[in-house]
Amino acid sequence: LGSFVPDLDNFVVAYATLAKLPTEGIHRTATHSVFFVAATVLVFYLIGQWRKDVRWVNLGIGLGLGNLLHSLLDMLVWFNGVNLFWPLGGEINFWANITPPEWFMKFMDPAEFLFFGIYLWVLGSWARKYNTDKDFAAKHRMWMMIEFALFVIFTPLVYIMTKGFLTIFGALYLFSITTAFLVTIRMRKTIEAAEA
């Protein structure tokens, strides 16, 4: 779950876009920061102490690690910087002096759907391997196929649409990240079986 948290800032970007507010400095800042990670771990640690339940502490550590791994992966894979120490500034961009081809940068948007599809495929493989979440298999398969279909549909669209692509893509991206987040929660038995 923690690896989804940093990109939930896209909901704020969407709101700002719809409200005609500036979107600069929203994505890959606060939710990608090590201070956000530390705050997440601390909040869940305090809840765990208050409730006297180590599961809350473990959840906070898991969310924090997932969040941190996401931010580090963004720095390695995307060609945009990450404000790892927000609000102190100092965007880190390993690729600052490299200009990737335009076709590749465009491809990165529909590739998000491909990666959601692969993630859901892995969950399904684990569910079959560990014989878990059988009652959710059909719905899971449907969500996975939707993600692969979105990838197939949006790959040519990113190259041929001159206006409106990011609005449609953004709405479906928010739908996809929400779906992946909820499917992950729904299939927690599968994830727990894979971790054992």
Task: Indicate residue ranges for each PLM-predicted region.
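N-terminal membrane-targeting hydrophobic helices
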Residues: 1-196
